[in-house]
């Protein structure tokens, strides 16, 4: 499968799931992005078009972590969950952004659940 086909396939999946998934201030959308070397996660309020919280493997508190392997993704998910709980957010809607729920995406979700987020 060529790179263009992969990108267009992911975009179609993303568009289809975005039609069904929306975040609010009470139950924001946990949106992830996985690049080859990093992982990013945001809590987004779609009704107000604002980002409530953002954590990535490039954050200042993650300087000692190298790459974006499964363990790094689990740590990023745990940090996101802890920061969300501190802001009073307990439930979220998970948006995998067209990526398969496997490997690093699953590790980030598991880390967020370990910290107490419900989805």
UniProtKB/Swiss-Prot annotation:
Gene3D superfamilies: 3.30.420.100
Keyword Calcium: no
UniProt KW Zinc-finger keyword: no
InterPro entries xrefs: Ribosomal_uL18_bac-type, Ribosomal_uL18_bac/euk
Alphabetically ordered keywords of this record: Ribonucleoprotein, Ribosomal protein, RNA-binding, rRNA-binding
Family annotation (SUPFAM superfamilies): Translational machinery components (SSF53137)
Entry GO MF terms: 5S rRNA binding; structural constituent of ribosome
UniProt-listed GO biological process terms: translation
GO annotations of cellular component type: cytosolic large ribosomal subunit
Pfam families: Ribosomal_L18p
Family the UniProt entry places it in: Belongs to the universal ribosomal protein uL18 family.
Function, as annotated: This is one of the proteins that bind and probably mediate the attachment of the 5S RNA into the large ribosomal subunit, where it forms part of the central protuberance.
Subunit-level organization: Part of the 50S ribosomal subunit; part of the 5S rRNA/L5/L18/L25 subcomplex. Contacts the 5S and 23S rRNAs.
UniProt xrefs under NCBIfam families: L18_bact (TIGR00060)
Name recorded for this polypeptide: Large ribosomal subunit protein uL18
Protein encoded by which gene: rplR
């Amino acid at each position: 499968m060529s790179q263009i086909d992969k990108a267009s396939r992911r975009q179609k999946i993303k568009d289809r799931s975005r039609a069904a998934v929306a975040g609010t201030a009470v139950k924001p959308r946990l949106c992830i992005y996985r690049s080859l070397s990093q992982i990013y996660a945001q809590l987004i309020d779609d009704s107000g078009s604002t980002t409530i919280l953002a954590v990535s493997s490039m954050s200042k508190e993650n300087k000692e972590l190298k790459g974006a392997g499964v363990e790094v993704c689990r740590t990023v998910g745990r940090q996101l969950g802890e920061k969300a709980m501190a802001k009073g957010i307990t439930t979220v809607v998970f948006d995998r952004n067209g990526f398969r729920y496997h490997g690093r995406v699953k590790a980030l979700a598991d880390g967020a659940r370990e910290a107490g987020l419900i989805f």
